Amino acid sequence: DICPPATTENYGSFTQGAAYSLLAKLYLNAEAWGVTFSGNAYQKVIDNCDKVMAMGYILEPNWKDNFSVTNENSKEAILAATFSSSDTGNDGNVKNELHNNTLHYKDYLSLGITASGTWNGICAQPEYVRLFDEEDARLDGTFLTGLMIDKSTGKPIMTDHNNELNHTIDVNMIPGMEYDGTNWSAVEQHDGARCFKWEFASDLTSSMGNDFHIFRLADIYLMKAEALLR
């Protein structure tokens, strides 16, 4: 009761909906974490999920709306870390720089966004990508893969080392391998599926304005379903 009610005005705050969601998550994993208490843990999961479901949250008809540039309007969001495209990182606000962390420095030519010089960083583990069925809409909606085409020319994008920018699912590297002096141009720097779940704004430069939903209603439905089965 000490948490504020789950209202639009309290978006981004730790509301009652967030509190019940966290309790459900804790009870669901209590056994794995070695936590003991009186009562049936799975019934407590169900009870807390039911409380969240009664608060007026709604599943978005299009799941991608939860990751759009304007996802602060999602009726599914329960607890969100909020971001703004105007965040500088120098004003006490953490910037959302997912695009810098995952995109190749020439992906912007294919995506039609302003941001260039991204850091060519993280990519998904191949085993994880292959968990998705090829016909699952979430596959293409989550990962950026394949040959990148320049929107302005219609031709394949070439990296600075004269290789076609083709994001393969497999990654040509050995985890933990120490640098052996190989020339950077010989490294398959375009390998790996990049994160494509959050929408990239066309005018994106240094900071993304998409919020990060820590809890959303879909998670509540899945937790209740697991508790009922277990």
Model-inferred region functions:
Residues 145-230:
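C-terminal substrate/ligand-recognition segments
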Residues 9, 120, 203-206:
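Hydrophobic alpha-helical segments with strong N-terminal bias
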